């Protein structure tokens, strides 16, 4: 079993709701590692020469408050290793017009959506947590204009209220859509809201999602390099114009993918 050290000094960091963060923790006491949990969820981590890198994310709906991360080991049931001071990010709002069928859902559509939620839950539960499949930093999928930013409160047809869990890029059809980093294709298929979708597992609890595609160019289980063309842009699912919805999930939370890139993760 892998042995790592437990830190002496408790670290403290600031983080916005909806953002991901990488923290290096220096260790100095040999123990058998099991898990690291933040916000009650297991988070990704890997080993370096003098410690571990922890990859956590702050849930979008979390309020300004102080939270703690814990290390679980064979020697200690739980030990505090990190204190996170959550700060509220000033997200915007927008009003969108989409086909009525995507707002006032028929019973069959609700049942379909519920099945999709369960299917994707299994995909995310199979996440690779303690190993990275990538060696380079993540990159924006497209250099084009961002048409809708992460975290916006979204009102559909003046009645359906939600929030935007990804970043939308302008992508006229047919624009080739590249992967943001190396990883394993975890899902391909047509989803009610997201249309034709590709999901990549990058390890360390990090997933990227590419939605509304007109064509999928990937197979579940294959390892794709950074920049591999996984699909062609489109207007499938709940969409009012051709574009790419790019979603990033870290430690089970949909986060602002640009925060991942900004830190060089």
Describe the residue ranges of each PLM region.
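Cationic-aromatic interfacial patches
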Residues: 1-90
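Terminal peptide-recognition signature
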Residues: 40, 69, 146, 169, ...
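Short polar/acidic secondary-structure junctions
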Residues: 59-61, 74, 174, 190-191, ...
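Surface-exposed, glycine-biased beta-strand/turn segments
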Residues: 83-194
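Short peripheral tails and domain-boundary helices/loops at the edges of structured domains
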Residues: 97-102, 249-265
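Flexible, gly/ser-rich surface segments that form the specificity/activation loops bordering the active-site cleft
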Residues: 134, 186-192, 228-242
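Short, well-structured beta-strand-loop connectors
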Residues: 176-187, 215-233
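Zn2+-dependent peptidoglycan hydrolase active-site motif and core
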Residues: 180-214, 242-247
